[in-house]
A protein has these predicted regions:
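Alpha/beta enzyme core
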Residues: 1-34, 38, 44-162
C-alpha cells in the first residue's frame, strides 16, 4: 500500500485544549494535501474546519471528550449540535465507569441515544480506551457499541493515562 492509498484510511486529528484557529487551519491544509479520510477536532472549531476542507474529507467531532463521564443527555445534545455545525462523523468517548461496573445495558442506552440524536447518515465511532480495560471488558464494550449503532470502535483518545 502506498502512502497515498493509506492516507484515505486515516483521521488527521488535533484535540489539544490549547489548539488555536491557526492550528486548525494548518490541520485542514495538511488534510487537504494528504487527502485523508477525515479530520477530527473539538466542537468549537467545526464551522472553521468545515469551511477549509475539501468536500471529500469528512469532519469528525469528539463527544464526551476526553473522559467520557458526561451525562448521556449531554452527549446526545453535543452530538446533535456537532452535526448541525458540520460534523459528518462523531467520535464518542464511552463512560468508563459504566464499563468498569459492567453496566452494559446503560452503556448501550447511552450509545443508542447518541446514535438516535445524529441519525443514520452520520458515522458514529465509539472510543473505548482499550489500554485501560481487560480483554473481557474490551470484548463486551465492542459488542455493546456495535449492537447499539456504532459504525466503528476506536481504541483510545490518546489522553487517558494508561
Amino acid at each position: 500500500m502506498t502512502p497515498v492509498e493509506l492516507a484515505k484510511y486515516l483521521d488527521h486529528t488535533l484535540l489539544a485544549p490549547e489548539a488555536t484557529s491557526r492550528d486548525i487551519a494548518k490541520l485542514c491544509q495538511e488534510a487537504n494535501e494528504m487527502n485523508v479520510a477525515a479530520i477530527c477536532c473539538s466542537p468549537s472549531f467545526l464551522p472553521l474546519a468545515q469551511g477549509l476542507l475539501s468536500s471529500q474529507i469528512a469532519v469528525a467531532c469528539v463527544i464526551g471528550f476526553p473522559s467520557g463521564a458526561h451525562a448521556s443527555e449531554v452527549k446526545s445534545f453535543e452530538s446533535a449540535t456537532a452535526v448541525k455545525n458540520g460534523a459528518t462523523e462523531i467520535d464518542m468517548v464511552v463512560n468508563l465507569g459504566l464499563v468498569y461496573s459492567a453496566m452494559w445495558l446503560e452503556l448501550g442506552d447511552e450509545i443508542l441515544a447518541v446514535r438516535k440524536s445524529v441519525g443514520t447518515l452520520t458515522k458514529l465511532k465509539v472510543i473505548i480506551e482499550s489500554a485501560a480495560l481487560t480483554d473481557e471488558q474490551i470484548i463486551m464494550a465492542c459488542r455493546v457499541a456495535v449492537t447499539n449503532g456504532a459504525d466503528f470502535v476506536k481504541t483510545s483518545t490518546g489522553f487517558h493515562k494508561s
